[in-house]
A protein has these predicted regions:
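A short catalytic or substrate-binding loop motif that flags glycine-/basic-rich loops and adjacent residues
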Residues: 1-4
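Conserved beta strand-loop-helix elements of the APE1-like EEP
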Residues: 7-15
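Polybasic, low-complexity RNA-engagement segments
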Residues: 15-171
């Protein structure tokens, strides 16, 4: 047998036209705590509710936004379905929503609420990328760090100090 010879088998399925049968994905329900924390977080953080046209679902302890018309992925290994929004941190008595890095990167300009805009040549940008805290006046809470208008990651402002939430593996 020569390298490259062999057989290929594929099962095709009709996706449009008459008599189409597509299974929809089954989503895991979102806990009441998670939904409450997500809504509180998004109201406090964004100027416009992101992913409002998508369905919320849980994969383990993580909250995802998935398009409603996603076909079933049963039998396929999907690295990630939808956008990871975040997870709950803290105790069961006092849970808090912790946003994911992928959420920051998926946000559109019109959805961004509180933000810290940095220029590409700003020394604060280098400090942020290295994991240091930044000084910035403003309202306490989560904010998106942006460079030239594009989201880079999260920070959490408390008493005019922005705590760095840039993922350690990317620093």
């Amino acid at each position: 047998q020569v390298l490259g010879e062999g057989h290929f088998v594929a099962k095709l399925q009709k996706t449009s036209g008459e008599n189409v049968m597509m299974k929809s994905a089954i989503f895991n329900p979102v806990s009441k705590d998670m939904e409450k924390q997500w809504l509180e977080f998004s109201r406090a953080t964004f100027s416009k509710q992101p992913f409002s046209d998508m369905q919320l679902t849980m994969f383990g302890e993580k909250l995802f936004a998935v398009p409603e018309n996603v076909p079933t992925l049963r039998g396929l290994k999907a690295l990630r379905t939808g956008v990871w929004l975040g997870s709950l941190q803290g105790s069961k008595q006092k849970p808090r929503f912790e946003p994911s890095h992928s959420l920051a990167l998926a946000l559109r300009q019109e959805e961004l609420g509180e933000r810290l805009e940095l220029s590409p040549n700003d020394e604060k940008l280098q400090r942020y990328m290295q994991g240091h805290e930044l000084e910035s006046e403003g309202q306490d809470g989560w904010l998106v760090i942006t460079v030239a208008g594009f989201p880079l990651g999260w920070g959490r402002r408390s008493k005019n100090i922005v705590k760095n939430a840039y993922p350690k593996g990317l620093r």
